[in-house]
UniProtKB/Swiss-Prot annotation:
Protein name, as recorded: Phenylalanine--tRNA ligase beta subunit
Cofactor: Mg(2+)
Organism annotation: Clostridium acetobutylicum (strain ATCC 824 / DSM 792 / JCM 1419 / IAM 19013 / LMG 5710 / NBRC 13948 / NRRL B-527 / VKM B-1787 / 2291 / W)
Keyword match RNA-binding: yes
CDD domains, A to Z: PheRS_beta_core, tRNA_bind_bactPheRS
Amino acid sequence: MKVPVKWLKDYVDFDINAKELGDRLTLSGSKVEEIITSGDEITNVVTGKILKIDPHPDAEKLVICSVDVGKNEPIQIVTGAQNMKENDIVPVALHGSTLPGGVKIKKGKLRGVVSNGMMCAKEELGIADEEHVHGLMILDENTPIGKDIKEVLGLDNPVIDFEITSNRPDCLSVIGIARETAATINTKYRNVKIDFSETKGRNIKEELEVEVKDKLCRRYMARVIKNVKIEDSPAWMQERLMLAGVRPINNIVDITNFVMLEVGQPMHAFDKKMITSNKIVIERAKDGEKFTTLDSEERSLDSNVLMIKDGDKNCAIAGIMGGLDSEVAENTHEIIFESANFDGTNIRVSSQKLALRTEASGRYEKDLDPNLAEIALNRACTLIQELNAGEIVEGVIDIYPVKSEPNIVEVDYNWINNFLGIKISKEEMKEYLDRLELTTEIKGDKLEVFSPTFRCDINIKEDVAEEVARIYGYNKVPSTTVKSQSIRTGKSKIQQIKDVVTDILISSGLNESINYSFVSPKIFDKILVPEDSELRNVVKIRNPLGEDFSVMRTTTLHSMMESLARNYSHNNELAKLFEIGKVYIPSENEGEIPKERNVITIGMYGNVDYFDLKGVVENLVEILGVNKISYARESENPTFHPGKTAVIKIKNTVLGTLGEVHPDVCENYEVEERCYVAEIDLDLLLENVSLSRKYKALPKFPTVTRDISVLVDEDILVQEIENVIKRQGGTILESLNLFDVYKGKQVPQGKKSVSYALTYRDENKTLTDKDVEKIQNKVIKTLEHVLGAELR
């Protein structure tokens, strides 16, 4: 909420500067975001009147202007602007002046003709030109000559930008901030000026009817203004609107915006001749209805959206935006001023559904005080007469079925002292509360606090205590040590394992990825999950952020593919990622919370293959002390490439899956690289982890290494080959490493060549070649016999 200090001073007197005021208001609970003084960089720029315009003798696009700047003689300025004429009043930067951005203006020559300054456009003064008018800034014809431009345009008027919390809609107004200012610095607050008279002869109740058909409209007020003159607002009003961040349009629209900023109550003006039925109806829209708003956008409505209607015809979305057909135009002669109060929750939901958030909806959704409607309407009528913009027809329509009444909170003043840790008298508390217009009566040790209707946030005794603390001063509340019992705790086993897993995977060259646990139900189609798969049985979120976040994930494969796809779209040639997250499995018993499983997901693409992924997994389980894992063919997982996927097992229990992602899945994520992914059940892994380490003496005897390369049928798993080698190698086979799998021209069709490096060591003696050859031959013969292998 931007509040010009000059506007604030209409309602409260103070002689401190904007910085000090901002600091004091922040300490009392009205947080100041920033203080803006737009004219700080502007010096020696004044208003000037163009007396004469002559052509430049040597340049067709330049003209020579004689400009009166309030001195003894006019000055000569050469310009290329085309939008001015004689007698126009413009900003003039004199010799030696400075402009925003550090621009300095000096005397000079343009094509041989002396120019003693520069006439300025809006942009050159640092003013946003929302109408995109090319050329000089033309000022009001009544602007005095030779005046400092900062004073004329209000650029020397500081603006304080407040961060208003949702529980204080009363502070979304100048008078709300004025109340806070008066209470904070302990001075008087002046109410907004209400002073107008009605014109006799016609009565609104004889020519306009209002029917409220829905409780979502809590109050509806209307007045008719006749003999309306549509013109520009006076400079003082335009200045205040612009400083508050609102673009001036015309006097009628500006009055509604001015009142909204000043009082905090949104208003709307209808062109009366467009309300052809002479009856305004407030009711909900019908599903599927179309309506074109003031911004020329056609919007689709539903039965939750509250509408303002001209009989049966829609003319405004209640509390959000008016319609294009009933807006005030240059030929408008009579208007209907609307000042109403609508249900805040409904306005917020409708605004979100329509993707249409306005200054009005932003206020209504915070539940405004219905009594503001009358103040705003009367203030608008006062401004109509002040600006001589029309005449107020006699009578007012006011439908207010359930009146809002002040709330009463009773609290013991001793409780407030104990709650805040201070010690002040009940009389002092009463003074603070009265300054905030929270009328207070002392009854013994009790304070009876009457909360006005504009303070909807005062409901319980803690609210009253907060108000006392704000004005007393948070900085005066003595600091105390919080009494607590220190409890020594450590990380749980799962937390410890997660930390270890993270360290292992990072040391393996992977980067951690973090993803949402809520996803779209459409992800199962992207990863080719069958319709009857248990993975599609998901936990649904009751109040989701949107369809893309409406269910809890049962697999992390989509999340990893999303992360890989994001890296690929940013032209990363190589990505190696991991995530430690959860999946959520619905309970079989209705009403029970879902089962959560911890999952490790590893994904990579680029200059990598299946064996890189497998190596990361094997390194992980080896460091975690998980023994005897095995691999088996996975033929029923459509997310993965058939024939290039395996399940990881501990004994006979499936620990996870790893393999190459199916090309169709990669295509669904627009990744034109082969992707490799592993999904491992961390909870099951945890049951088999052994982080304890035993000392083992360094070996005394050397190793002997032999390579072996065999041809086997294509469908034989590498795991089967390794199982045979390990059994026959016995205790002296220290390790075996797969270093090649080949299918090609030199290998018969239907076969593959598999090559291993076998490392032997005997802990009790040095192995001879004869010892090794004996075991090596035993391995080869068993491979030939069991798997039909051929030695290459």
